[in-house]
Amino acid sequence: MKVRPSVKTICDKCKIIKRKGKVMVICENPKHKQKQG
């Protein structure tokens, strides 16, 4: 999980979602997981 000021999709399978008011990227590749913080 990477915490970044701006989250971007890295590959085609990355999805941007909102969880508890936080913007997150979920993906099949665990290295692509990000959240905004």
From Swiss-Prot:
The keyword Ribosomal protein applies. Keywords: Ribonucleoprotein, Ribosomal protein. GO terms for biological process: translation. InterPro entries: Ribosomal_bL36, Ribosomal_bL36_sp. It comes from the Bacteria. Transmembrane segments: none annotated. One of its GO terms (molecular function) is structural constituent of ribosome. SUPFAM superfamilies: Ribosomal protein L36 (SSF57840). One of its GO terms (cellular component) is ribosome. It holds the Pfam family Ribosomal_L36. PROSITE patterns: RIBOSOMAL_L36 (PS00828). Belongs to the bacterial ribosomal protein bL36 family. PANTHER family: 50S RIBOSOMAL PROTEIN L36, CHLOROPLASTIC, LARGE RIBOSOMAL SUBUNIT PROTEIN BL36C. This is Large ribosomal subunit protein bL36. It comes from Heliobacterium modesticaldum (strain ATCC 51547 / Ice1). The lineage of its organism: Bacteria, Bacillati, Bacillota, Clostridia, Eubacteriales. The gene is rpmJ.
